[in-house]
A protein has these predicted regions:
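Hydrophobic membrane-insertion alpha-helices, especially the h-region
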Residues: 35-56
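Short, well-ordered beta-strand elements
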Residues: 63-72
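Short, polar/charged alpha-helical segment
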Residues: 76-98
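Acidic, glycine-anchored loop motifs typical of Ca2+
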Residues: 92-119
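Extracytoplasmic "Venus flytrap"/periplasmic binding protein-like
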Residues: 118-191
Length: 252
């Protein structure tokens, strides 16, 4: 058998093909393919950082929080007027250079026999109220539609003389000795609150804001943990101011 070999002097055309020139669109697509995860992470970090800065620097934090607890919300005009009227009685407790009073509404019906209660709003109201009454809650002053139901269910109030029941879960606390009627308090009834237009966003009923608040009772949070007393010192001063000259008629 004979072997066929190539002449060692034979030459080949080894000129390589010129490299391909990618378009800008192809280059961008290639870069995105390998770096999209890093871009997403960077964007999330920036967004989170902006949110933190906004929350810590620009968010308005109330110096005083007042809670209204009733079966229906207060008119928006009433809430705004009350916040504005209480502001001159308060000071900058959180040191942010502003004095802000915030009235929070909790829609709760303590009458278990009421079949007209909206279960969704009831659950939402109870959940929010329970959270606020926890050890981290800031609310000290309460405007109550049903003080008996509130105290029976929460055991959160203190007596008007500043004492608290030995056991916050006691069932025999006399709520009548824990609250004033709004109309018992000369300072509160003397507030210039103006009027409201519409009990809700869906009607055009008008009236005075004092008439909306006249049927409410005013109570304050009981503090059993001495470590929490400094938390409510500023609010306690506000309570003393608002109830100055008041004589309770809750037992009548």
């Amino acid at each position: 058998m004979a072997w066929v070999t190539k002449d060692s002097t034979e030459t080949y055309n080894q000129t390589p093909e010129p490299p391909r020139e990618y378009t800008k669109k192809e280059k961008a697509a290639n870069w995105w393919h390998y770096h999209w995860m890093a871009v997403v992470v960077a964007v999330l970090v920036v967004v989170f950082g902006v949110w933190i800065i906004k929350d810590t620097v620009f968010q308005t934090r109330p110096d005083v929080q007042v809670a209204y607890v009733g079966t229906s919300d207060l008119p928006t005009d009433t809430v705004t007027a009350l916040q504005d009227a209480l502001t001159p009685f308060c000071s900058d407790l959180n040191g942010d250079g502003k004095v802000v009073v915030q009235v929070d509404s909790y829609t709760v019906d303590f009458d278990a026999a009421n079949e007209n209660t909206d279960a969704y709003y009831q659950m939402a109201g109870v959940t929010r109220l329970s959270a606020e009454l926890s050890s981290g809650g800031k609310t000290y002053i309460f405007l109550l539609e049903d003080p008996e139901g509130f105290e029976t269910q929460t055991g959160a109030l203190q007596y008007l003389d500043g004492t608290v029941p030995d056991d916050p879960e006691t069932t025999d606390a006399d709520w009548r000795e824990m609250v004033y009627r709004w109309t018992d308090c000369p300072v509160l009834t003397g507030l210039d609150l103006g009027g409201y237009e519409g009990l809700t966003l869906m009607d055009d009923v008008t009236g005075t804001n004092q008439s909306v608040l006249a049927h409410l009772y005013v109570g304050r949070r009981g503090v059993w943990d001495e470590k929490q007393i400094p938390t409510y010192e500023g609010c306690a001063e506000l309570w003393d101011t608002l109830t100055a000259g008041a004589v309770s008629t809750a037992a009548e």
